[in-house]
From Swiss-Prot:
Coiled coil: none annotated. Substrate binds at residues 144, 329. This is Alanine racemase. It catalyses: L-alanine = D-alanine. Its cofactor is pyridoxal 5'-phosphate.
Amino acid sequence: MQDINSGSSSMKDTYSSWIEISKRSLSNNLDNFRSILRPNSTLTAILKSNAYGHGIEPMTRLCIEAGISRIGVNSIEEALLIRNIDSKIPILIMGEIQNPEKRKDVLSDPNFWIVFSRPETARILSSFLPAPKLHLKIDTGMGRLGSHGETLKQTLSELKNVGITLGGICTHFASTEDVLEHKYSLMQTQKFEEAIFLAKSFGYNHLIRHACASASTMLFPNAHFDMVRIGISLYGLWPSIQTRLSLNLTGNKNFQLNPILSWKSRIVHIQYHPADSYIGYGSTFQTSYPTKVAIVPVGYYEGLDRKLSSNGDMLVLGKKARIIGRICMNMTMLDVTHIPGAEVGSIVTIIGQDGEESITADDLADRTHTINYEVMTRISESIPRIVVD
């Protein structure tokens, strides 16, 4: 993935498409989250999965510049990308580490904070010199990773018996984004507090406690503990419509998120077709009037969902242009008959705003029956990311 700074943005004239990342919008989002954090709780920026499609390397630089003191990722490989940019910043690795003994050369980093579920993983990691910090994952109702119930007691006992030091304890909410009634999340919070109390009974008294992701940070201030993990909303996207409605119900109607990503391309070819012409693979679309067709060099390889074929729009000169025919691997066709000024070289907005019109990740998710997380993370790493404003 190319990471292009704002000083090189003129190079976008040569790209098939490019991503623009708004530094100002990122700063606004961070300020909004910092304003609602409980005292003594800190913010960790989650940059896993190529920073939710935004580009892990440019996002790392922007977050550090914005005063972020801790970054979270999924994998060792992601952590190493960040470590190449900053040699000291603490990095929370949340994905399960496989065969850690084979990665001793890179995991021997005291500023790696590694989340683990299995005692054997902790034993191996704690033997490294220097050893990474270890954060025990608690399954409070997600049913995925972590210890719970009698297994948790056994895990804590085993860790204590072999003298393993813990740096933190964490959990993850299962359904905060999906509901307006949050009894299950409150139950999870109670279970997490019980796990913290149990850990203290084994002598683990000064752990960094963290549970909240984006939605729960907005909705559950009592669960901020020592640290929150902000992912999707760092990038200005709501976790769900239910999250936004739930926040409104709490009386907080002023919390704002600003999407930081725009995805743009250019028209590379114009064709004129008479009525009753077929467009694209499979001849699935037939014109019903003389049609001006614009070709955009973006397709499903670049991350544009094929389900948007004849089912979506892009923006050209501030107007919506309908996608016609099947989206190709590297090209998409638009009906620009109603946009007289559309020509080769005209900028096309795939995600973002152009004049009074906008197309959001949520718009694309609604059209393709998925979530904004998937829309963003599908965007190809090969597309250059350019920092603007």
